[in-house]
Amino acid sequence: MGAESLVAGLAIIGIVIVVSALLSGLVDRSGLPQVAVFIFIGAALGPAGFGVFDMTLTSPVLRVVATLSLTMVLFTDAVTLNIKEVRRRAGLAFRMLGPGTILCAALTALVAWWLLGIPPALAAILGAALASTDPVLLRGLLRRRDISLVTRQALQLESGLNDVVLLPIVVVAIFLSGQHELPSASFPKIGFGLFILGPGAGIAIGLMAVAALDLIRKRIGVRRDYESLYSLGVALSAYAAAEAVHGSGFLSAFAAGITIAALDVELCDCFIEYGGVTAEMLLLFTFVIFGSSLIWTGFYGLDTRTVIFAAFAILIRVPVYLISMIGSDVDKHGRLLIAWFGPSGLSSLLLILLPVFAGVPGSDQLFRICALIVLISVVVHGSTPMLFARLLGQHEPEAPPKPEAPNEPRPLPVLELVQPTGTQSITLEELDQLQKSGEQVILLDVRTERSRDTSDSQAEGSIRMPPENVVMQARELALPKEAWLIAYCA
């Protein structure tokens, strides 16, 4: 049985990687919700399909995968934040988190208590979980270039910061739901572990990690792709360190990510380039696990009150965020998009699993309600990028190709002039040789916005090309296909 479980696990991991790679282009162009694809893959592999595996709330594997996923979600949220942008947009961040996230959570909890008769502590957990926005669903919308910069920044700030606001609510409510078993002296200890030990351990691990990496960089050097794996190791180490001292491992992972984001821009960019893909694979793998059977429990015992509550939980965001955006510099269309697009997804499911793992009575009901709302949100919010693309005319006509100049004899073959040091790099001496030989050479500044914040200097004659949607940008810039395109990112 152990061997069969291992084979099934490896098969699922392989399917996630292969399918996500094959569908990446289709998802980007069509706006198709990637999450929905993996939920249905899970359904096909689950008991209703091929019966490869059946996951329940008591499965030990679920706890391991959920813990890893929530750790990666919080760390990724933190490490991808642009700290300078957060400071610059502090007022906007407050609007998104204060009147926005917290008020949505409070109103949802109130209606859950009033309409569904859920105890106050459990209602608070449900409200907080449903107020969390899903990073995977949100990523597809943030990649669109026809959304204004301030709108993207607002959604990024909310996605990066709202989980760290909601997680303490969930943790405190879990303890309150079982407070009859806890002495009053336990609450200061719980608060100390949650708000001091957890973040403190994360900051300490982050500081040591950045210092060690900086030392090794200067003396030996570190490969860029391995720096992303290094950051993943930091996330897991921060979680373990906090749990070892009875702190919150999840808040520790977030604190470690914030520390890295504040101190080491290059490591953050490495994580976005390489580690971010690894983390996303884990999150998609988690969707497959939920899709096997767990998420479909949302239809069990469905009644009119639950349907009304689900509609309220999804729609309450619209008036709350429209009001919170009054007086901001976000335009009307941006406000409507922000107010509408608050998808519930993996983050909501992971937060709602915390009381399940803690053995809180009635938490299985919370999971079923949350699963139903996540399914609705995947359909409703997941189709938003696709509808948005159609409304704004995503498929812009391609610029006609420039007439090619007649071939002219070149003084020397390029291969005789340049012996590349690698398939992805070129030295300054080789660049100089190319330019002197008469070759058409175009320098591309492909630094991320975060990297440019440290220095706005740009190589003379280079063209700015952010590292997103590069094919579309190349067409817009009419870059000649026969030219040498040399990109630099530092």
Predicted regions and their residues:
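Generic N-terminal simple sequence motifs
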Residues: 29, 131, 407-409, 476
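A generic secondary-structure signal marking the coil-to-beta-strand transition
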Residues: 41, 71, 424, 440-442, ...
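Hydrophobic alpha-helical segments and helix-packing faces
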Residues: 281, 304, 424, 455-457
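Positively charged, proline/Ser/Thr-rich regional signature most characteristic
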Residues: 429-487
